[in-house]
């Protein structure tokens, strides 16, 4: 009996020693594969664009996941770039005059192709221009092609229309789905277009299509009706709408219209993402589209650098204005481009997921503004400290405010809640 007790004590001591050795290796935390130095690009975000200038692709491909160009195939050079840069190209049958053999050849050469897009705006007289019955008469060959190539079929892309009797896209789709030639089960997702300039109107428009119980693809959108008065208005629209699209479960994909058009970048409706220069560059609007947070709530940012204010995983109010940062000190410290929060106002909350390798004792906020402000810092939902931020006297007069706090090593959520005042916020760091 004594021998058994003795052996048991040895086993317990050994297990405790092993636990201590493990503890010395660092904080116990989440799966290491979920700890990242920067958030990956959004799986939802894409563009509606024909990449004929190969200089455009390196600008957008690090930040977007898919593209379509209203055609059956992209250019050969673009297709190769997509394959090597984690971008998905979606062939489209714009109307009934598509080339099935070209689509077959493309899918054979690019077997990772997943989707086939159907007719473009059939209820517009200057687009595919089809009644539901006319579209249904052309539907079965499209279904057969998708099944042959093992592609998921996306519905005709709907918008408010000009076809007599079918200005309402819901009416067109309801009639289309009710026809005997059409089996709704053959359709994987619902494609829609929207150019309303009100973010709340866009949200309400999306909700109308949720009744079909299928993933929604917003395959063309920007603020255009009414035409925005400035690029700043387009930027604010983009921020609010993208925050909703990234967090709305029913939306699986979205594509901005359009990265570059034939008009000047600084002309209405101010929606271009890429300049007309040689070589081209991202416009400020393009930088926002590329860098806006994917709102990832599963990954943890490694807290070994300042965190851009825009790297949040959640926020209280979607109407948050972001702009390319003008805080050169932060950009140099982080080593990459980023966005600043231009309207951090009282009551707004920004939440981040951070992983600390070591215990932290200080929080630093980089800010500027015309009023005195106080920011409440919450760690894992509990108030850790309040940071006083005296006014800096200018919109680009960046400075740092510091406050002591205590954070153990490991994974934490940090929420910045503006308790009073208003300011611009470029970044923060716990150290």
Which functions belong to the PLM regions below?
Residues 44-114:
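N-terminal carbohydrate-binding/catalytic regions of secreted carbohydrate-active enzymes
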Residues 1-18:
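Sec-dependent bacterial lipoprotein signal peptides
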Residues 110-132, 153-163, 185-194, 252-260:
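Active-site groove signature of glycoside hydrolases
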Residues 16-39:
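Bacterial Sec-dependent N-terminal signal peptides
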């Amino acid at each position: 009996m004594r021998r058994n007790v003795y052996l048991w004590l040895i086993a317990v001591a050994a297990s405790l020693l092993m636990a201590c050795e493990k503890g010395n290796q660092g904080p116990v935390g989440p799966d290491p594969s979920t700890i990242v130095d920067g958030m990956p690009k959004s799986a939802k975000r894409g563009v509606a664009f024909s990449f004929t200038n190969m200089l455009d692709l390196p600008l957008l491909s690090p930040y977007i996941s898919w593209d379509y160009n209203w055609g059956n195939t992209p250019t050969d050079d673009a297709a190769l770039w997509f394959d090597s840069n984690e971008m998905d190209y979606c062939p489209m049958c714009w109307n009934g005059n598509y080339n099935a053999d070209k689509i077959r050849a493309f899918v054979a050469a690019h077997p990772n192709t997943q989707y086939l897009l159907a007719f473009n705006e059939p209820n517009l007289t200057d687009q595919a221009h089809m009644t539901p019955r006319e579209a249904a008469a052309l539907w079965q060959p499209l279904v057969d092609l998708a099944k042959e190539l093992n592609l998921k079929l996306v519905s005709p892309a709907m918008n408010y229309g000009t076809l007599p009797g079918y200005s309402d896209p819901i009416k067109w789709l309801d009639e289309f789905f009710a026809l005997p030639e059409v089996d709704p089960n053959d359709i994987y997702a619902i494609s829609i277009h929207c150019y309303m300039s009100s973010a709340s109107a866009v949200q309400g428009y999306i909700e109308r299509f949720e009744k079909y119980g299928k993933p929604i693809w917003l395959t063309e959108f920007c603020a255009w009706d009414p035409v925005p008065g400035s690029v700043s208005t387009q930027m604010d629209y983009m921020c609010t709408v993208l925050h909703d699209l990234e967090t709305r479960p029913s939306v699986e994909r979205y594509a901005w219209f359009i990265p570059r058009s034939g008009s000047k970048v600084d002309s209405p409706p101010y929606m271009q993402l890429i300049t007309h220069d040689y070589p081209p560059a991202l416009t400020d609007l393009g930088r926002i589209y590329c860098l806006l947070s994917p709102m990832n709530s599963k990954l943890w940012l490694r807290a070994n650098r300042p965190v851009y204010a825009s790297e949040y995983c959640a926020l209280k109010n979607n109407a948050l204005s972001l702009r390319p940062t003008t805080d050169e000190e932060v950009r140099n410290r982080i080593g990459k481009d980023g966005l600043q929060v231009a309207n951090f106002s009282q009551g707004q909350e920004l939440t981040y997921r951070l992983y600390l390798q070591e215990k932290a004792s200080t929080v630093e906020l980089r800010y500027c503004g015309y009023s005195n402000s106080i920011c409440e810092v919450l760690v894992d939902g509990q108030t850790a400290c309040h940071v006083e931020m005296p006014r800096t006297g200018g919109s680009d007069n960046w400075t740092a405010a510091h406050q002591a706090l205590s954070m153990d090593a490991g994974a934490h959520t940090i929420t910045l809640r503006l308790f009073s005042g208003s300011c611009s916020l470029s970044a923060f760091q716990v150290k």
